[in-house]
Amino acid sequence: MPDYLLTFELSKDRDELFIHGNAAGLRYLARVASRLAEHADGGRREHDHLMTEEWAGHELSSVAQDPAASLLNQVTIRGWPTRGGAHDLP
């Protein structure tokens, strides 16, 4: 389990994503996003997987913060070098 709080949770209606984090968890998420942005700036497609311990990871917390929401055990963040993202692939 990470020494910070960071969860991604889907609302009961599954139409809204909630990100819960303490200061350290949000800083970790910012570092991941910053690293992906650097790759995208360099013209490279890159991604990162964030997972709970239950899914053999250590990046996400395992305890949902909203009892009505569904905890996501894996989040994949993709960085794209163009605005079109996957739609710009040959």
Question: Which role fits each region the language model picked out?
Answer:
Residues 1-90:
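Positively charged, low-complexity terminal tracts
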